[in-house]
Amino acid sequence: MRILLTNDDGIYSNGLRAAVKALSELGEVYVVAPLFQRSASGRAMTLHRPIRAKRVDVPGARIAYGIDGTPTDCVIFAIARFGSFDLAVSGINLGENLSTEITVSGTASAAIEASTHGIPSIAVSLEVDWKKTLGEGEGVDFSVSAHFLRRIAGAVLERGLPEGVDMLNVNVPSDATEDTKMAITRLARKRYSPTVEERIDPKGNPYYWIVGRLVQDFEPGTDAYALKVERKVSVTPINIDMTARVDFEKLKNVLFGESLQTGRTY
């Protein structure tokens, strides 16, 4: 089996190293990851300049490249360079990736990119103190999250994903053990309420930080509720077709004030 591994924390992240060790038991692991921290880069691609690749020694990997680009760049580079894969994994991320805000996450977006190429994909994230989310994982124990990654990846490689599921978004609580239960969940509506804080520089000019206020109330059945309230491993099936499952007649009535039942064509 050929497995692509990437992340958004960078190729030197301890979370990526833990993922290599877990996945190497299942197949050949090809690592293509950003050379530097690229959290919150979403599904951005580098189109305005060339990207450069550097061979990096990653124990347990079949081959490893660091890319001076985004996580999505890494997936595109890997497929162009090495062909398709049986599975793509993004992680293990420092910090959870929950709710519809996974579209901001470089971790989740890399898995989404791989799934657009027809590759079953998994994004896996470990809940950690926010102060550790921009480091390389020093002092963080990834063993339990690696256990769940190996377990879930093995199941996907053996049985595939159900029809209509393109990727799995997995979040592991910081206090999880190998006996922690898993929950199949849906995305919460929101995890953060973003706003802007103003500061003044030494010359008296304003500058701004985008900051997120945590949302505390989550509906049962969501990924945020499973992780934050039930302390379970959340597994959310994702379909990259974001078309709303709505009766088109109702939307036509909103847009045009009439339905097809009147005989009117649109």
From Swiss-Prot:
EC number: 3.1.3.5
Keywords for this protein: Cytoplasm, Hydrolase, Metal-binding, Nucleotide-binding
Paired cysteines (S-S): none
Catalysed reaction, written as an equation: a ribonucleoside 5'-phosphate + H2O = a ribonucleoside + phosphate
Gene Ontology CC: cytoplasm
The keyword Cytoplasm belongs to this UniProt entry's keyword annotation: yes
Cofactor names: a divalent metal cation
SUPFAM superfamilies, per the entry: SurE-like (SSF64167)
InterPro entries, per the entry: SurE (IPR030048), SurE-like_Pase/nucleotidase (IPR002828), SurE-like_sf (IPR036523)
Principal subcellular localization: cytoplasm
Top-level taxon: Archaea
Binding-site positions, a divalent metal cation: D8, D9, S39, N93
PANTHER family documented for this protein: 5'-NUCLEOTIDASE SURE, PHOSPHATASE, PUTATIVE (AFU_ORTHOLOGUE AFUA_4G01070)-RELATED
Family: Belongs to the SurE nucleotidase family.
UniProt-recorded name of the protein: 5'-nucleotidase SurE
Organism: Thermococcus gammatolerans (strain DSM 15229 / JCM 11827 / EJ3)
Taxon lineage: Archaea, Methanobacteriati, Methanobacteriota, Thermococci, Thermococcales
